[in-house]
Structures are given as C-alpha cells and as structure tokens.
Amino acid sequence: MKITNNGRLVVISTERSEWRNLYMTKNTELIVLHTTKFGENSLVVHTLSKEYGRRSFLLRGVGKKSGMSLFLPLTLLEGDVTESSKSTLYTIKGLVSRHPLMGIRNSIYKNTMTMFLAEVMFRVLKEGVYEQGMYEWCEKNILLLDAIQTDFSNFHIRFLLELAVQLGFRPETTDLMPFVGDHYPIVQQFMSLPFAESMLVPLNGSVRNEIAEEILRYIEFHTDSAVNINSLKVLRELFA
C-alpha cells in the first residue's frame, strides 16, 4: 500500500490487515452431535454451538491418544474457532470439556439416551441455521439429565416434545392426533405436567417406545427431515 505524506512516498505493509480479514478466531461453546472422520488424523465435528447454531467444524491432528471421550454424544465443549472467508468449513482447536457429565457417562441408560437425542438433533437441525435459544435449552436439558438419579426413563419423550416447541411448532390436538392416535391422552399429560411429574407418568417399555417413534414422525413431518434414527433400536431394546 502506498500513500503520500507531505510530498513523500510512505510504504505501509497491509499483509497483516489482509490476513485478519481472511481469518478471525472466536472462542465458543459447543455441544457435540456427531463426528465424521476426515483424512488420516482429522475430524469434522458436527455441533450445536452457542455462537453459530448448528455448525460443523474441522479439527486437525486427532490421534488415538487425543481423548476421543471429548466427542461422545452431547458432550459440552469449549474451543477456538478460526473463521475463514475462503471456506464455509471453519477450523477449531483448543477443545476442552466444560462439564464432566459423570452422571451420564457412568450410566449405560443415560449414555444410550444421549446417543439417541444427539442423533435426532443432528438430523433435524439444519446445518448453518441459528435457532434462537436452542443452545441454552439443550445445555439445560443435558445438565438436567446428568443430575437426575432416578426416574428418567421418560426423559427422551419430554425432550422430543420440548424440541418441537423450540423449533416453533407447539404440539396441539389437531395436528398431533394423526401421529399419536390413542396415545394422545398420555402425550397431553407430558405437555401439561411440570417436568418432575412428567418423569413419573407410568409407562411400560412398549408404550414408551411407540410414543417416541410417533413424536419422531411428527417432528419429521414438520421439519421436512428424513429422521432415520439408527440409535432408536438400541434405545428401544434398553428400555423394553
């Protein structure tokens, strides 16, 4: 860059400012939804992030000793995102856990539930879309599941119904009935009861699984998503 100062030619380097325009780093909070292997030692981490909404990031230099436990479903992380004007796939580094979630990780039932819920959100939330309040709501529910010690078998049903509300379509009788049929009175209980009481609604495994599948079809219809949840079978067997 050249400018004239009192008749003299002054040369100012713009390399640094140009670099800043191309790359900018931000610290953000993340919730892990899914990961995809990329090359020999990199991962694409699909997340729900506080700053960017539903977004995928490239993490380089991931080895077997890098602590893959960081990428378990619904893990709460914090990391530095480098934005680039040259690519829509931003890179991320410096990932650290924000909460150990020991109440979840020490329970096969809760781990299976988080695997299911993370997969639902991975498939339903659209890449690059920011849903106001979605991150905060999801984080609150993860910490709630982590803290509950008993009576959480109904948690995923409550989560799915609240997810529908967060997405902007509150379940009502007229449009919910075709999906849940005879189970509507039970679903109505879940929508009207406080959280703690909804966890105590008596359901056998078969009915609980049927309701979960029905609500998934309802969400699928309203989001125009192909919600083919692989982990549903595992959840169904575990809570049979």
Regions found by a protein language model. Name each.
Residues 1-23:
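N-terminal amphipathic/basic-hydrophobic helices that include classical n-h-c signal peptides
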Residues 19-43, 48-240:
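Non-catalytic alpha-helical scaffolds and adjoining flexible linkers that form interface surfaces
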